[in-house]
Amino acid sequence: MQQVWNGIDQPEQMDRELKGQRLGVVSGGGAVDKNLCPAVDVLCRRYQVTALFNTIYGIRGEFMYGERVPSYVDRVTGMEVESIFNRERIAPTPEMLSRVDTVVFDIREAGTRFFEYLHCCAAIMKACAAAGKRMVVLDRVAPIGGVAVEGTVCPPTMHTIVGDYGLASRTAMTMGEFARYVNGEYGVGCDLTVIPVQGWRREMYFDQTDLPWLLPSPSLNGTTANLLYAGMCIFEGVRTVSEGRGTSKPFELIGAPWIDGRELAARMTARGLPGVDFAPVYFKPASSKHAGQVCQGVQVLVRDRQAYASFRTAILLLDTIREMYPEQIAWEDNSAGHDVLQPPSQPLFTRYLDKLLADADYTSGVVDGEGLIAKHAAARQNYTRRKAKYHLYD
């Protein structure tokens, strides 16, 4: 295990940046220090915190996926936690920011553009720039490494909560690097400071460090789930297929009541995809799609994560289900998810899967999975070059 110190574990650097400032804190579930103390509590005890802001899952991760997150009083600090994630906004208002000098952002990310916290970070940077406030990002390790770039790339016209800023599906950046990338490439003009991680290298996964895994969101229960999420999240855009939410193996179990699990597993095994096996499985989700119904499908078993391709595996699995059961496939419409950046009344894409893929050609049948990956090859290479300028780690 490699010893690693996230930004929150470096008091001397934090003191240089935060002492004497009125702080607004944005944090969430899983953001703890090495002593398992939530970052919000560390900051409140050490500095003058005058505002707490919550995003998708609450400042302590106490809300579930898709649940409305209101403003509320935090039981530990006694402070009001102001909601900055609702149908109107994903950043503090000018009035909220008037009570702070610096916004401190410390949130676990998932290494994918689907994870809404990235886009919250960018929106908060823009709000700080407009209000003349500083922003300090306490960086954390990239949980599935900072090397492999996968999937499709957002076009310049795409501005959604699951895709923006020319990002690839698997971003291969830390949150601090992402903030630097957005600030530099998109001219945000935020007075930005990143307190880097110490001891982490780009090729390292979370479970190769000495850091404890606490849930960054309710369904990401470990490094493997996070790696699977980087691809299997696309099934959130398929109304009729469960991605395993409501089970103990989200993103590892994929299925539906009408699927023949043995046949699907056999077809996927025949594809010879590297680093992964497929086992036929039965499961019954307690919530989400097909709740209370017995589903058949596959359990996706990562055997070699260096060889495993998250996005390719997921899109070819969807290809296979689509080939087997063309009449059963139905797409979620644009109202799925909780997107405030691109409301349904102003869609670039009409289907939620189009947003997750950053491309409408797949659902319309213009390309299959391999064709979609090939279509975005040049864009992935360009993204990889652009982001490298903002790397903080070797």
Positions of PLM-derived features:
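Conserved functional hotspot residues or short segments at active or partner-binding sites
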Residues: 255-377
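Glycine-rich, aromatic-lined ligand/substrate-binding cores of catalytic
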Residues: 200-281, 285-288
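Short internal beta-strands
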Residues: 50-57, 138
